[in-house]
From Swiss-Prot:
NCBIfam families membership: PRK04286.1-6
Endpoints of the signal sequence: none
Pfam family, one: Lactamase_B_2
UniProt cross-references to Gene3D superfamilies, sorted A to Z: Ribonuclease Z/Hydroxyacylglutathione hydrolase-like
Cross-referenced InterPro entries: Metallo-B-lactamas, RibonucZ/Hydroxyglut_hydro, UPF0173_UPF0282_UlaG_hydrolase, UPF0282_hydrls
Organism lineage: Archaea, Methanobacteriati, Methanobacteriota, Thermococci, Thermococcales
Protein name, entry field: UPF0282 protein TON_1363
Family of the protein in this entry: Belongs to the UPF0282 family.
Amino acid sequence: MRVIPLASESLGVRSLATFVEASGIKILIDPGVALGPKRYGLPPAKAEMEVLQKMRRKLQGYARRSEVVVISHYHYDHHTPFFEGLYESSSESYAREIYEGKPLFIKHPRENINFSQRKRAWAFLKNTEPIAGKIEFADGKSFDLGGVELEFSPAVPHGSEGSRLGFVVMTLIDDGSKRVIHASDIQMLNRKSVEWIIEKVPDLLITGGPPTYLGKRAEGSWQAGIKNLNEIIRETGAEIILDHHIIRDKNYPRFFDELEEIPKTFAGYLKVEDRPLEAYRRELHKIEKGGEAEIPFKLS
């Protein structure tokens, strides 16, 4: 099995897009890239916009190769919408290239879903139903792809129990020799998702950490995330790729150090430098205006 992390916060954008080739079947999970429209009261810096375009080109390249598409939920950093979006680098042609003629395994568009995601799911289905090979509402189901089992969790909270952000589904890919779980926006903050991961005993877990960058709005999430991740590490022995929300916090290396096994970011897994651009947006704007600011990565 070949696992290729495509785009994420450690690579400069909001995403957890991943390409998996298992027994010759090419699977694209959460094909979206985006930028936070406001951070520290600032719009994306020029460096972020450039990386967004680069990540979009990379994502489309892997979309052309992929045969199966999985969507965990309907936030725009996890799927590509059909509209022209500046901070999503989206368009109808990009979306068609990703979804046309392919089987889509997607989070249920009407059950266990909040109002915002329900609207987005409606728009997504309106555009994909005429062009997709087939569409499966995947929550809690398993599918045999011919030597590869694709298993989906029931809908679990996007973050902590009772989250207003809705629900997501996790994906297990098993080719008989390796088990990989992609668990996008669980944020390591709810028991249901932690217990499902432990029950499935993955060899590799690709997941996002808690949104500690939100400060008081995410109070207690640091400690809860550490506790839950350490439990998964102890109970499964899985290799962990940890990225997404936690990398929007400049203090994420300290979070990694508090874990019993230090995970890799997407960048670390690809053996390139972490470039958490959003976390350093204030500094990037200063540099782009000709000022000086310290950042822990190279800009090009």
